[in-house]
Amino acid sequence: MSEIKDVIVQGLWKNNSALVQLLGLCPLLAVTSTATNALGLGLATTLVLTLTNLTISTLRHWTPAEIRIPIYVMIIASVVSAVQMLINAYAFGLYQSLGIFIPLIVTNCIVVGRAEAFAAKKGPALSALDGFSIGMGATCAMFVLGSLREIIGNGTLFDGADALLGSWAKVLRVEIFHTDSPFLLAMLPPGAFIGLGLMLAGKYLIDERMKKRRAEAAAERALPNGETGNV
């Protein structure tokens, strides 16, 4: 159970692919102009990570070490092609919006990195969980960045959600404030870099605060009974 918890915590927070490893920044910065686009690409990446980790872990004993990387890339490309066709069939609007960034998941360092670092060494169930956790960590980062950019830039949230979830999702659109002239800085690539920088700073501050609280709690437990540590 502790290993499962560690895999989940590492993927979602401690070893977050976007905020700690800084991998896959090209799609992260390019696609996150809206929350819908960010969520769509994040979920697609999560599905690819989960399936490729599961497949590579299952086949790890039959994969020659000398040619393992080309085999990993072939497996990843096959899964990405299947996911691309699914999005094309069931979410064509999202497919058009994401464009080239769906097939580019094949070259995403996150996918190949987890295959080599984790799936090739661990069992199928734990590898699938690792892929899912890493993918959801990246999805959360994309979603937060996309939401911030959409709110600041257009004053809306979940605009175009019907492209991802179907016509019923039009009711999810929220207009936080009305604007006739969008704030282009937030919608263009410079806004993505600024937003990512703020998210990195925020995560650092949260980690430092948590580290300080753990240190204070450990110091209090180490004191003899009745002592408070105050002079």
Swiss-Prot record:
It is found in: Cell inner membrane. Keywords: Cell inner membrane, Cell membrane, Electron transport, Membrane, Translocase, Transmembrane, Transmembrane helix, Transport. This is Ion-translocating oxidoreductase complex subunit E. Pfam families: Rnf-Nqr. GO terms for biological process: electron transport chain. Part of a membrane-bound complex that couples electron transfer with translocation of ions across the membrane. Required to maintain the reduced state of SoxR. Probably transfers electron from NAD(P)H to SoxR. It is an enzyme of class 7 (translocase). The lineage of its organism: Bacteria, Pseudomonadati, Pseudomonadota, Gammaproteobacteria, Enterobacterales. InterPro entries: NqrDE/RnfAE, RnfE. Residues 84-85, 146-181 are periplasmic. The chain crosses the membrane at residues 18-38, 39-59, 63-83, 86-106, 125-145, 182-202. Belongs to the NqrDE/RnfAE family. One of its GO terms (cellular component) is plasma membrane. The complex is composed of six subunits: RsxA, RsxB, RsxC, RsxD, RsxE and RsxG. Its EC number is 7.-.-.-. Residues 1-17, 60-62, 107-124, 203-231 are cytoplasmic. It is a multi-pass membrane protein.
